[in-house]
Amino acid sequence: MLSIRLSRPTDLEPFCAFLRSVHVHAEALEDGSVRASVPGAPTPLHERRELSGYVTTWNALNPGRSAEVV
């Protein structure tokens, strides 16, 4: 399970919906971050790489907004 920080609190729900659309478990936290996990990821490294790819895609599709795996 990894944490992802967003630049805008208003992006919390749209970002979680984006992750869920690619079958990632995503939970919005009160501090404005997202806790995410990839079901069936064989290793933590695989999970990090896959989530990093989704974060990169989100950032490319949403100019001026950013998400970052922390």
What are these regions (language model features)?
Residues 1-6:
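Short glycine-/aliphatic-rich beta-strand segments at the starts of folded cytosolic domains
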Residues 8-12, 48-51:
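Generic alpha-helical secondary structure
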Residues 11, 33, 41-43:
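Generic "edge-of-domain/loop-turn" microfeature
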Residues 13-33:
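A short, structured beta-strand/loop element
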